[in-house]
C-alpha cells in the first residue's frame, strides 16, 4: 500500500508497543503462542502495536484465525506465507485497528462512509521486509506509518530478530543497516524493537554507537541485577555459567520513551514456560 495518507493528526500521540519472542523451537508452539497473546490482550494496557518474533508457521495460522486478532488488528503476512517458507520461523506485526487504518478506509471515513472517526487514526503507508546480512536468513519487518507531525514523511516501525550466538559481527552490520533505515530521507524517525540477541558487551554498545535511544536505559538507567531489564533466562535454572540477559530491546529515534516494563511468561502444564524470553511493553510519544 503506497497511497498518500490523508487527514494526518498534528498533535502529539502516545502509543503502546509489546514485543515478544514466542520461541518456536520448544514443543506446543500454538498453545504457547495463544497463551502469550491472551496475556498481552488481557493486560491493563491494550497494546497499539505488537511485535512477535520466532513465529512458526503453525503459530502464524493460529494467530490469523484468532477471533480477537481478526476483529481488532491489522496483521502482516495475512495474505500469504511467503516469508515463512524455507525458514523455521519469522516475525509478525499486529497493529490495533482502533489506532491505525489503511489509506483507503481513511479516505472513506473522511467522505462520511465510515464511522466518522478517521481523524483519530494514524494511517498505514506501506509494509516491506528488508533483507539483512544473516547466517539465519533474518530480516527486518518494516511498517511505515504516515508521520502525524510531518506531512509527507513516515514513522518507521522495525520488528527485528538479529542473528544468534557468536555472530556479533553480523549483528553489528545488521544494526548499521537498521539505524540507516530510521535516517532515510522521508523518515521522521521510529522504533527498532525485538530480539537483539545482545549476549556480548559489544552488542550493548551498538545502540549508543548509532546514536539511538534505548528505552530501558533512558527510563531505568540500570541494566544489571534483578531490575536490570533482563528478558532471557529469567526465573529458570541456567547451566554452564549462563546468566539472565537483556537480549530484547526497544530503541528509538525521534521519539520520547515514557514507560517500559518486562512481561514475565507464565507456565504451561506447570513446568514449561510460554517462552524462554520475557516480553517488553513500552509506551512512547510521537
Predicted features by range, described:
Residues 25-29, 223-226:
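Short, solvent-exposed loop/turn elements at domain surfaces
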Residues 16-22, 36-64, 143, 156-160, ...:
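Active-site beta-strand/loop signature of hydrolases that rely on acidic residues for catalysis
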Residues 1-24:
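Membrane-interface helix-coil boundary segments and nearby low-complexity
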Residues 28-36, 55, 86, 135-138, ...:
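Soluble or luminal CAZymes and related metallo-dependent hydrolases
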Residues 29, 49-154, 162:
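Structured beta-strand-rich core segments of catalytic domains in phosphoester-bond hydrolases
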Residues 10, 94-98, 143-150, 253-254, ...:
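Active-site beta-strand termini and strand-to-loop segments that position acidic
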Residues 1-7, 183-191, 197-286:
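Metal-dependent phosphoester-hydrolase catalytic domains
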Residues 13-16, 88-90, 136-141, 153, ...:
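Residues that flank catalytic or metal-binding motifs in active/ligand-binding sites
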Amino acid at each position: 500500500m503506497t497511497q498518500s495518507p490523508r487527514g494526518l493528526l498534528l498533535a502529539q500521540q502516545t502509543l503502546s508497543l509489546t514485543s515478544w519472542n514466542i520461541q518456536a523451537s520448544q514443543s506446543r508452539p500454538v498453545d504457547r503462542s495463544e497463551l502469550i497473546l491472551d496475556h498481552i490482550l488481557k493486560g491493563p494496557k491494550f497494546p497499539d502495536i505488537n511485535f512477535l518474533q520466532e513465529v512458526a508457521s503453525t503459530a502464524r495460522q493460529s494467530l490469523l484465525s484468532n477471533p480477537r486478532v481478526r476483529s481488532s488488528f491489522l496483521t502482516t503476512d495475512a495474505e500469504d506465507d511467503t516469508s515463512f517458507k524455507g525458514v523455521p520461523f519469522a516475525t509478525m506485526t499486529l497493529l490495533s485497528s482502533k489506532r491505525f487504518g489503511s489509506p483507503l478506509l481513511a479516505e472513506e471515513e473522511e467522505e462520511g462512509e465510515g464511522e466518522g472517526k478517521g481523524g483519530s487514526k494514524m494511517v498505514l503507508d506501506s509494509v516491506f521486509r528488508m533483507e539483512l546480512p544473516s547466517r539465519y536468513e533474518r530480516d527486518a519487518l518494516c511498517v511505515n506509518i504516515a508521520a502525524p507531525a510531518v506531512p509527507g514523511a513516515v514513522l518507521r516501525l522495525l520488528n527485528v530478530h538479529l542473528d544468534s550466538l557468536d555472530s556479533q559481527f553480523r549483528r553489528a552490520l545488521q544494526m548499521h543497516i537498521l539505524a540507516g533505515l530510521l535516517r532515510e530521507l522521508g523518515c521522521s524517525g521510529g522504533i527498532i524493537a525485538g530480539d537483539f540477541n545482545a549476549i556480548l558487551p559489544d552488542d550493548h554498545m551498538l545502540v549508543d554507537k548509532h546514536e539511538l535511544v534505548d528505552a530501558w536505559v533512558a527510563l531505568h538507567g540500570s541494566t544489571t541485577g534483578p531490575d536490570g531489564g533482563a528478558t532471557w533466562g529469567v526465573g529458570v535454572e541456567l547451566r554452564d555459567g549462563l546468566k539472565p540477559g537483556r537480549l530484547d530491546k526497544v530503541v528509538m529515534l525521534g521519539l520520547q520513551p515514557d514507560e517500559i516494563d518486562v512481561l514475565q511468561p507464565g507456565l504451561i502444564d506447570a513446568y514449561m514456560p510460554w517462552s524462554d524470553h520475557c516480553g517488553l511493553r513500552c509506551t512512547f510519544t510521537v
